[in-house]
Amino acid sequence: MDGIRYAVFTDKSIQLLGKNQYTSNVESGSTRTEIKHWVELFFGVKVIAMNSHRLRGKARRMGPIMGQTMHYRRMIITLQPGYSIPPLRKKRT
């Protein structure tokens, strides 16, 4: 899985599953067309819409040094009725 890092399971994303919308974090350098092409090819589904937004990394401190985690992009993928994506693995914390 080149573009998709992991599926997102929040209260909102679980609600969106009822509307045939799937939420996942993807690599920040990926474009919408790359992700759409990859999802259609890998899962054999038809994508009708994609929404994306970039999320800033969180601030982290290691002793006196301030740093931050990497920025990332989140995609909400809407599929045509009748198609579904099997559950993706959850990120380990």
From Swiss-Prot:
Chief subcellular location: plastid
SUPFAM superfamilies: Ribosomal proteins S24e, L23 and L15e (SSF54189)
GO CC annotations, alphabetized: chloroplast; ribonucleoprotein complex; ribosome
InterPro entries tied to this protein: Nucleotide-bd_a/b_plait_sf, Ribosomal_uL23-like, Ribosomal_uL23/eL15/eS24_sf, Ribosomal_uL23_CS
Keyword list, A-Z: Chloroplast, Plastid, Ribonucleoprotein, Ribosomal protein, RNA-binding, rRNA-binding
Family to which this protein belongs: Belongs to the universal ribosomal protein uL23 family.
Protein's job: Binds to 23S rRNA.
Protein name in the entry: Large ribosomal subunit protein uL23cz/uL23cy
